[in-house]
Amino acid sequence: MKNNIELQNVSKKYKDFELKNVSFCVPEGCIVGLIGENGAGKTTTIKSILNITKADGVVKIFGKDNKKEESKIKEQIGVVLDDSFLSDYLTAKQIHSIMKDVYKTWDENKFFQLLKQFQLPTDKMIKDFSSGMKMKLKIATAIAHNPKLLILDEPTSGLDPVVRNEILDIFRNYIEEDETRSILLSTHITTDLEHI
């Protein structure tokens, strides 16, 4: 079985926090939970995988060095970070216009199909979305270019149980569609992982 992510002794030191010798793999066809309380280093680990945070150690994605082959790798990754998204003054339709130029594999039909499935309006500004609607839009945007790997940082935090379960079902379906796909999901809600 191939690994879509491999970490070996990844470390990052801050003034008041240290991530020390983190090692794990995310095999193809699997959803792997990165579990820990707030402040445990989950986001730092994810940002190290994505090369947003420069860390020591070895990170391989699809068997390739995450620093040397970053642009090739990122084309195949869908990411949902809590602190990253486009302007609240955009609509879903405008996000489509931007993303189709960002990703070579952007699938317009899939994006609008997901918006319909999630019951998201295409012409309403994001600032007027609920937190659950915003998360669904982030997920639709992350999935619409058919990535091989999803990396999700606390995607269900602060959502009501019904929306949370709906989003978790989306992740399960994403994996079931293609056995070479993987998800790395950080959470402090262990029942989320039990659900999927």
Write out the residue ranges for each language-model feature.
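Conserved ABC transporter NBD signature motif
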Residues: 51, 57-68, 72-73
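Catalytic Walker B motif of ABC-type/P-loop ATPase nucleotide-binding domains
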Residues: 150-154, 159
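Walker B catalytic motif
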Residues: 154-155, 167, 171
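Conserved beta-strand
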Residues: 7-10, 17-27, 34, 57
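Helix N-cap at the start of a conserved alpha-helix in ABC-type nucleotide-binding domains
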Residues: 40, 161-163
